[in-house]
Amino acid sequence: MTSNSDGSSTSPVEKPITGDVETNEPTKPIRRLSTPSPEQDQEGDFDEEDDDDKFSVSTSTPTPTITKTKDSSDTSTVTRRKQPIRYIENKTRRHVTFSKRRHGIMKKAYELSVLTGANILLLILANSGLVYTFTTPKLEPVVREDEGKSLIRACINASDTPDATDTSPAQEQSPAN
């Protein structure tokens, strides 16, 4: 604040900061991640002139590959490229990925039950032996009661290959004509 010769005070006018503070040059517009529209080329042209990637900082977790494409109006868009699904060797990274994906699949199960009214029972068995569950209220007794718990234990402890008694023709039912 400054005071005038008549004793009144004035406050400086605040201007919004635009551009680089030190050089006062305008900054580049922010690019947002987006998926290409069906009309755009899915392969995309790589922007050779953009050198923003040379200042990137490496992180402990790998980020998805980002492809820069140009559309007909010369504005560049950034799209994500799908990473191949393979076993994660790093134990810490594997645990973090498991936790995030477990949370994501439970969120999807909840959304599916709310949107469609479906009854859902989701069991996730971790390598550590812990069982994570998501149930809608109607199926909750399957997880909470002793009979349901014993059924879940039997399924978890069962072998991966079907028994010979399970595939006998006498137990198979054919549709009535």
UniProtKB/Swiss-Prot annotation:
UniProt KW Iron-sulfur keyword: no
Biased composition (Polar residues): 1-12, 158-177
Stretches the record annotates as Disordered: 1-82, 157-177
Segments traversing the membrane: none
Start and end residues of each MADS-box domain: 80-134
Low complexity bias (residue ranges): 56-67
Keywords tagged on the record: Arginine metabolism, DNA-binding, Nucleus, Transcription, Transcription regulation
SUPFAM superfamilies reported in the protein's UniProt record: SRF-like
GO biological process terms on file: arginine metabolic process; positive regulation of transcription by RNA polymerase II; regulation of arginine biosynthetic process; regulation of arginine catabolic process; regulation of arginine metabolic process
Impact reported for G148D: Decreases the physical interaction with ARG82
Cleaved signal peptide residues: none
Lineage top rank: taxon: Eukaryota
Gene3D superfamilies hit by this protein: Transcription factor, MADS-box
GO cellular component: nucleus; RNA polymerase II transcription regulator complex
Biased composition (Acidic residues): 40-53
Annotated SMART domains: MADS
The protein's name: Arginine metabolism regulation protein I
Name of the coding gene: ARG80
